[in-house]
């Protein structure tokens, strides 16, 4: 649920904001250049006028309010699992990934917590109706499991397909040709996914869903980073509506969670219930975007 508020800046700046706001002596020196000194009051005033200060404060209040309201329901094991999944996905590049996205390890884990807390709040406030579930059922597809070989050129992908046509093993070709270092050593197998999964290009998902068990793509699939060859491992039948209530409900929640209008209203309600208020007149508008239809008054 990646649309939820990004808290990467939190670690970089929020400590200073909190520290300065709670100081008993605003004239305490924080820095010096030449014979000039910068007091805490001067620094706080400058920080207060920065556009990012409102974003930082909003992130702090939202995270804090959600944690206060739903922290006891947070699955910490799932947060840790998600964090480790990112670490595994990026491998030796994980630290670079964090730096490029303005995260520390702590703030990145907070972002994951924030996503889970927001989803908990969403489920508390909204429930899919039977008609919504039936509408979701029309386009529902079960999760599938595939192997893939990721290449940077169409020619390489065509070479792979030709070798598959000649009876060579998909797993051995994945090991030899796939540029996906995370899956090339395990036959190119990917975790089960569905059409709602945003990790994969739509062309990849559409190409995969056309396959029956043990079939592979006869033409390279064009994706953002090159060309894919896909083999179907498990393509379950759709089943029946009565047995798929849980999956349909989760699919609807995932769609709602990616809708900024819906999530702003959800967060607005949490802020209202937690009696969030901003005392500083210069930062008063930090939560304006969440006042919306719930008419919250911060």
From Swiss-Prot:
The keyword Transit peptide does not apply. The keyword Membrane applies. It catalyses: [protein]-peptidylproline (omega=180) = [protein]-peptidylproline (omega=0). It is found in: Cell membrane. Keywords: Cell membrane, Isomerase, Lipoprotein, Membrane, Palmitate, Rotamase, Signal. One of its GO terms (cellular component) is plasma membrane. Residues 141-234 form the PpiC domain. Its main location: membrane. It is a lipid-anchor. InterPro entries: Foldase_PrsA (IPR023059), PPIase_dom_sf (IPR046357), PPIase_PpiC (IPR000297), PrsA_foldase (IPR050245), Trigger_fact/SurA_dom_sf (IPR027304). Residues 1-22 form the signal peptide. A lipid is attached at residue 23 (S-diacylglycerol cysteine). A lipid is attached at residue 23 (N-palmitoyl cysteine). Its EC number is 5.2.1.8. One of its GO terms (biological process) is protein folding. It comes from the Bacteria. Belongs to the PrsA family. Plays a major role in protein secretion by helping the post-translocational extracellular folding of several secreted proteins. This is Foldase protein PrsA 2. It comes from Lactobacillus johnsonii (strain CNCM I-12250 / La1 / NCC 533). The lineage of its organism: Bacteria, Bacillati, Bacillota, Bacilli, Lactobacillales. The gene is prsA2.
